[in-house]
From Swiss-Prot:
It comes from the Viruses. Signal peptide: none annotated. The lineage of its organism: Viruses, Varidnaviria, Bamfordvirae, Nucleocytoviricota, Pokkesviricetes. Transmembrane segments: none annotated. It comes from Sheeppox virus (strain KS-1) (SPPV). Belongs to the poxviruses B9 family. This is T4 protein. InterPro entries: Apoptosis_reg_M-T4, M-T4_sf, Poxvirus_T4p_C, Poxvirus_T4p_N.
Length: 240
């Protein structure tokens, strides 16, 4: 191959690379770069009971949210006090799917269209999710996992009642709209074999089975004493 041929080859390669790079830069708008979503996925394998398809209900409070249905409750809240929050707990959507005749439940708790991720107060970036079973009336036997995203100063803590839950695999995704379109990034998975497959359903297929949880109404009579601390965090009650 002559020197001229090599020169032409590398020139074409440079032009192509520059062109592709330029296209990549222009693909995302400023709005897409500054609009974020957070998604927490929980694959819950039940122990000694089957999660019946009783429906799923979401109850939102100023400091968090809770879900009811399928034999357990999930309490999600941040670390903000009544004085620190503006009634804007960042997770606001709950979807669920029941697999394998109730042996597995996949829960997705998420939010989208966040434009203030970096300016959120520190307390709002500390998010706790606790899985508590309806059939357990005493203090939880807890297993705790945590994951952090240092670039965004976000931390997630997941607590599971292992007296009625055999296993939980979890994923947390934090990404902006640009990353969602073009890059598989911002995802952290922890749990069994670093997978979030649930029963025979792969992670990418959950979207085909998820149903949106209905809006429910809070009834304090449904909650045991060991769950009251979560309720106080979610609704900013000093006592129950």
């Amino acid at each position: 191959m002559s020197s001229l041929t090599l020169f032409i080859f590398f020139l074409q390669l440079f032009i192509f690379t520059s062109s592709v790079s330029g296209i990549s830069i222009k693909r995302c708008t400023e709005e897409e770069n500054n609009t974020w979503e957070i998604e927490v996925g929980l694959c819950i394998q039940t122990e000694n009971f089957r999660a019946i398809k009783t429906g799923c209900y979401k109850i939102q409070g100023p400091g968090g949210l809770l879900t009811e249905g399928n034999g357990f409750k999930i309490f999600a809240h941040d670390d903000c006090s009544k004085e620190e929050t503006q009634n804007n707990f960042i997770l606001d959507s709950v979807n669920k799917a029941v697999y394998a005749l109730g042996k597995y439940v996949y829960m997705e708790i998420s939010t989208s269209n966040i434009t203030t991720l970096y300016s959120l107060p520190q307390c709002a970036k500390r998010i706790s999710l606790s899985i508590s079973c309806d059939q357990v009336t005493t203090e939880m036997k807890s297993y705790v996992e945590s994951v952090s995203f240092k670039d965004y100063d976000l931390e997630f803590v997941i607590t599971t009642d292992i007296s009625c839950v055999k296993h939980v695999s979890s994923s947390v995704i934090v990404r902006n709209e640009c990353e969602k379109k073009y890059i598989s990034t911002g995802k952290k998975i922890f749990g069994f074999n670093n997978k979030i497959d649930c029963s025979a359903v792969k992670f990418s297929e959950h979207v085909n089975y998820l149903k949106t949880c209905s809006v429910g109404k809070f009834d304090r009579k449904k909650y045991y004493e060991h769950q009251h601390n979560y309720i106080k965090k979610i609704f900013h009650h000093n006592e129950l």
